[in-house]
C-alpha cells in the first residue's frame, strides 16, 4: 500500500514546503519529485530504515535526497528524463493518519551545509508540526462537540 504525501499549510493558506520545492532549479526539483514518488510514497516512515531517512524525534523525520532524478528512477527500474546533477536536499516530514506523510519543510544542504542552518530548518519544521497538531486537535474537538 502506498503512502499519500501532503504539504503543510499555514494559517494563511500558504504551503511553504510546496513553495520551497517550486523554488528549486529544475534538476533539483526533478530529483525531489522523483524521490518523493519513488521512495517516500512507497516506504513512508520506513524510509528511516534506509540511507534516505533519519528519525529526529517527537514525530519528525528527515528525508535525505542525495541523488539526482536519473539515479533515483534508475534504481527503481524507471526511465529518467535528464542528465546527472549533484543534489543534496533535506525534507522534514511527519507520518500520521492512514499512511499519510506531511511535508513540513526543506532546504538545499548542498548550498548551505552548516549545522547551524540545519538546526534552524529543523526548528522551523518542529514549529510547523506543533501548529499542525494544534489544528488537528481543534478539528477533533469541534467534531466531538457537533455530535
PLM region descriptions:
Residues 1-87, 108-147:
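Basic, Lys/Arg-enriched alpha-helical interface segments
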Residues 89-94:
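Short, surface-exposed beta-strand/loop micro-motifs that present aromatic residues
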Residues 95-103:
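Active-site beta-strand-loop-beta-strand hairpin of nuclease catalytic cores
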Amino acid at each position: 500500500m502506498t503512502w499519500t504525501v501532503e504539504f503543510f499549510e499555514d494559517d494563511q493558506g500558504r504551503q511553504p514546503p510546496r513553495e520551497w520545492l517550486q523554488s528549486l532549479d529544475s534538476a533539483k526539483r526533478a530529483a525531489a519529485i522523483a524521490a518523493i514518488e519513488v521512495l517516500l510514497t512507497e516506504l513512508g516512515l520506513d524510509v528511516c530504515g534506509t540511507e534516505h531517512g533519519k528519525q529526529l524525534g517527537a514525530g519528525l523525520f528527515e528525508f535525505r535526497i542525495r541523488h539526482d532524478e536519473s539515479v533515483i528512477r534508475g534504481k527503481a527500474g524507471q526511465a529518467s528524463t535528464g542528465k546527472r546533477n549533484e543534489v543534496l536536499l533535506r525534507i522534514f516530514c511527519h507520518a500520521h493518519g492512514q499512511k499519510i506523510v506531511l511535508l513540513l519543510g526543506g532546504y538545499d544542504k548542498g548550498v548551505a551545509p552548516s549545522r547551524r542552518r540545519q538546526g534552524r530548518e529543523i526548528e522551523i519544521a518542529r514549529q510547523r508540526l506543533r501548529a499542525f497538531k494544534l489544528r488537528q486537535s481543534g478539528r477533533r474537538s469541534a467534531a466531538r462537540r457537533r455530535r
